[in-house]
Amino acid sequence: MNMSKAEAFWQLTRMNRPIGSLLLLWPTLWALFLAADGLPDWHVLIVFVLGVVFMRSAGCVINDFADRKVDGHVKRTANRPLPSGLISSKEALSFFAVLVVCSFLLVLTMNTLTIMLSSIGIVLAIAYPFMKRVTYLPQFVLGLAFSWAIPMAYAAESNQVPSEAWLLFVINALWTIAYDTQYAMVDRDDDVKIGIKSTAILFGRYDKTIIGLLQLSVLALLIVLGSQLALSGIYYWGILAAAGFFVYQQWLIKGREREACFKAFLNNNYVGGLIFIAISASVLYQS
């Protein structure tokens, strides 16, 4: 089936697959609702939601640009707009620049601290795709990139980045490494052949164990966060439910089948949503 130019750009941003935007949105909302005691400023909320959409789209574009010479050798990615020739490298870079500018125009309506922090976020978004060629730990860089909205959210709401923001940052970074390792398990065999590095390759036969340890660390630190902020019992019920989803994910990846690993990755959307409900319900109940 022939694809129009507009459809190709839409696919390039993965707007047809919103899971990445959701996984970036949930921790942003965690931070906004915690920083604002459950009632974030509407202007700030809209800016951050739109910023998530623009920056996630920009991240997908620069990722496909970085992978344009190898995606054609992977069955799952061979039909993407860049390797298939529907979009040129120059067009992709121009589109990336437009998305970044749109994001920056949004953040310019925030305070100075938020604007300063945003520059680091842009660097992380650009760096991640290229890390897959130089280190087996690109998921760590993605963890930083997908967590950077957290200190930005606190800065936007309170003009400071307290210790709880950095604890939440670590929690989300560990969670990101866990679920992106699940995602990397899907393409592990292809990645080995074409020289792409990932934690799935680095961890090898210990992949499931390390993912489990990361998930346990996330749960433990969420409990620490709840204790520090004196969150209500509603919050802990949410953490218990999230633990149940982590157990389910471990069951899914036990045989390392591609489809099951991808299903485990997708399941993390429910984890992020549950934690958001737990946080927002708890802080609203207490306010």
Curated annotation (Swiss-Prot):
Localization terms from the record: Cell inner membrane
Catalytic activity: all-trans-octaprenyl diphosphate + 4-hydroxybenzoate = 4-hydroxy-3-(all-trans-octaprenyl)benzoate + diphosphate
Source organism per UniProt: Aliivibrio fischeri (strain MJ11)
PANTHER family, per database record: 4-HYDROXYBENZOATE POLYPRENYLTRANSFERASE, MITOCHONDRIAL, PRENYLTRANSFERASES
GO cellular component, one term: plasma membrane
InterPro entries in alphabetical order: HB_polyprenyltransferase-like (IPR006370), Prenyltransferase (IPR039653), UbiA_prenyltransferase (IPR000537), UbiA_sf (IPR044878)
UniProt family annotation: Belongs to the UbiA prenyltransferase family.
Principal place of residence: membrane
Record key words, sorted: Cell inner membrane, Cell membrane, Magnesium, Membrane, Transferase, Transmembrane, Transmembrane helix, Ubiquinone biosynthesis
HAMAP family: UbiA (MF_01635)
Any one biological process term the GO annotation gives: ubiquinone biosynthetic process
Gene3D superfamilies, per the entry: UbiA prenyltransferase
Organism domain of life: Bacteria
Functional pathway: Cofactor biosynthesis; ubiquinone biosynthesis
Pfam families the UniProt entry points to: UbiA
Segments crossing the lipid bilayer: 19-39, 42-62, 95-115, 136-156, 166-186, 210-230, 233-253, 264-284
GO molecular function, one term: 4-hydroxybenzoate polyprenyltransferase activity
Enzyme Commission (EC) number: 2.5.1.39
Function field: Catalyzes the prenylation of para-hydroxybenzoate (PHB) with an all-trans polyprenyl group. Mediates the second step in the final reaction sequence of ubiquinone-8 (UQ-8) biosynthesis, which is the condensation of the polyisoprenoid side chain with PHB, generating the first membrane-bound Q intermediate 3-octaprenyl-4-hydroxybenzoate.
Record's protein name: 4-hydroxybenzoate octaprenyltransferase
EC primary class: transferase
Signal sequence coordinates: none
Cofactor(s), names only, from the UniProt record: Mg(2+)
